[in-house]
């Protein structure tokens, strides 16, 4: 399976084991040679469904910040394949189950967010702007999902218009605030506890392709 792509990266005799993936069209395969993992993942990520270029751009920015993201070994745009570093299975969620101190993990996550907020980097030409339109579209998910659940019907156009008007008012100050990188999917399944790394680098970040 996909032998040429792996062979050109020096991986000849191998076995692939598909691992549980997130809610996306990506598929992840752990690579084994001689029954041992080599800490690399083969990722099939269809560019028509996934933001592959956004992933690469954001990975480069986070690396520039000296944060831990899976190192991209190779990318084949035509075949929609990535070869990336394997962070293993110790997500924050699994780490909590395995007895890692809860305060330690949550403090690490918060300190990582603070560090990103303070980082001085010009993102205007690198990532999409978290615009009013994008923010309102995300707020509208409330009406799309929660409103019908409570009221057993879809919201009227009048309700939608009033909802948008309220959010436009609330977002005025927000849109004038400092422009920073926003991960947009920062939660315990997308954070890894890398115990062999120090300080903020012990927080591994994934699933950041839609960052703004």
Where are the regions a protein language model picked out?
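Juxta-kinase regulatory segment immediately upstream of eukaryotic protein kinase catalytic domains
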Residues: 1-15
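Activation segment
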Residues: 91, 96, 151, 190-195
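Active-site acidic catalytic loop and adjacent metal/ATP-binding pocket
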Residues: 25-32, 116-117, 167-212
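ATP-binding glycine-rich phosphate-binding loop
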Residues: 11-32
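ATP-binding pocket architecture of kinase catalytic cores
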Residues: 29-137, 175-176
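Residue-level detector of short coil/turn "hinge" positions at structural boundaries
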Residues: 13, 68-69, 155
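An alpha-helical support segment within catalytic cores of ATP-dependent transferases
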Residues: 2, 121-128, 133-134, 138-182, ...
């Amino acid at each position: 399976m996909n032998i040429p792509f792996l062979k050109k990266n020096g991986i000849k005799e191998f076995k692939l084991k598909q691992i549980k993936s997130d809610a996306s069209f990506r598929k992840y395969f752990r690579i084994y040679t001689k029954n041992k993992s080599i800490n690399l993942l083969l990722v099939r990520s269809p560019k028509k469904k996934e933001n592959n270029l956004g992933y690469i751009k954001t990975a480069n920015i986070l690396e520039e910040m000296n944060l831990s993201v899976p190192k991209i070994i190779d990318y084949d745009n035509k075949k929609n394949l990535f070869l990336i570093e394997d962070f293993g299975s110790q997500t924050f969620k699994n780490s909590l189950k395995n007895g890692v101190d809860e305060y330690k993990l949550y403090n690490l996550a918060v300190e990582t967010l603070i560090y990103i907020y303070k980082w001085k980097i010009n993102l205007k030409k690198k990532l999409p702007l978290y615009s009013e339109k994008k923010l309102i579209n995300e707020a509208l998910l409330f009406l799309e999902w929660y409103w019908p659940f409570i009221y057993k019907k879809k919201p009227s156009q009048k309700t939608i218009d009033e909802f948008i008007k309220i959010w436009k008012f609330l977002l005025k100050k927000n849109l004038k605030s400092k422009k920073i990188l926003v991960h947009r999917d920062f939660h315990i399944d997308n954070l890894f506890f890398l115990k062999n790394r120090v300080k903020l680098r012990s927080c591994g970040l994934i699933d950041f392709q839609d960052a703004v």
